[in-house]
C-alpha cells in the first residue's frame, strides 16, 4: 500500500507513470496494493497524477526514440481526498491522459498504452479551485483523455466502480471526464471499456 498525506507541493505523483520528455520509453507499472492520497491547502499550479498514466511528450513519428508507452495496472483501491486545494493544471486519478505531439500506436515496434483498473476508485474534491485558463485544465478520473497531434491508439479497461464526490469552482475552459474517453486529436481516438458503475455527487 501507498499512503501520502501532504500539504504544499507543486506536483504529486503516486503509484503511476508520468512523463514530460522529448524522447522516452515508458515501462510497465503494476499497482497491486491500495493507494491513498490526502492533501490540504495545496499550492497553485499543482499537478496530481495518482495511480495513473500521464504524458506530456514531443517527438517525431519517424524517430525511433519517440515516446513508447506500455502497460499500467491498478489492482487495489485508489482513494484521493483533496480539501481546499488549488489546482492550476491537472488532476488525474487512475486513468490515462496524454498531451503529445508523438505517435502512440499499435505496430510491430510500438505497443499501445493500456490501463487496467481492477480496484475501486474513490475521488473526493472539496472546494477546489482551478486557476489556469488554458484548455488543458482538466480532471480525468478512471478514463482516457488526450490532446494529440498525431496518431494515437489507447486501451482502457475499468472493471470496478468509480465514485466521485466533488465540489469545485473552475474556469470556463475546465472540464471533467469520468470513466469514459475523450480526445482532441488530429487522428485516431481510443478504445475504452467500463464494466463498473460510475457515481458522481
Predicted segments with their positions:
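Surface-exposed loop/turn motifs in large extracellular/passenger domains
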Residues: 1-201
Amino acid at each position: 500500500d501507498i499512503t501520502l498525506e501532504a500539504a504544499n507541493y507543486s506536483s504529486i505523483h503516486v503509484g503511476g507513470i508520468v512523463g514530460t520528455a522529448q524522447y522516452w520509453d515508458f515501462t510497465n507499472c503494476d499497482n497491486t496494493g491500495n493507494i491513498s492520497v490526502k492533501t490540504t491547502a495545496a499550492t497553485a499550479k499543482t499537478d496530481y497524477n495518482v495511480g495513473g498514466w500521464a504524458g506530456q511528450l514531443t517527438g517525431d513519428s519517424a524517430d525511433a526514440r519517440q515516446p513508447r508507452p506500455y502497460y499500467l495496472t491498478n489492482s487495489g483501491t485508489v482513494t484521493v481526498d483533496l480539501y481546499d486545494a488549488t489546482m492550476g493544471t491537472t488532476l488525474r486519478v487512475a486513468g490515462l491522459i496524454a498531451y503529445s505531439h508523438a505517435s502512440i500506436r499499435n505496430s510491430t515496434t510500438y505497443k499501445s498504452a493500456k490501463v487496467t483498473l481492477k480496484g475501486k476508485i474513490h475521488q473526493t474534491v472539496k472546494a477546489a479551485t482551478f486557476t489556469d485558463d488554458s484548455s488543458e485544465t482538466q480532471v480525468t478520473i478512471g478514463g482516457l483523455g488526450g490532446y494529440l497531434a498525431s496518431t494515437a491508439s489507447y486501451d482502457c479497461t475499468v472493471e470496478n466502480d468509480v465514485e466521485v464526490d466533488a465540489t469545485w469552482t473552475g474556469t470556463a475552459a475546465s472540464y471533467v471526464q469520468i470513466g469514459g474517453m475523450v480526445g482532441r486529436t488530429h487522428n485516431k481516438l481510443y478504445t475504452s471499456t467500463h464494466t463498473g458503475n460510475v457515481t458522481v455527487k
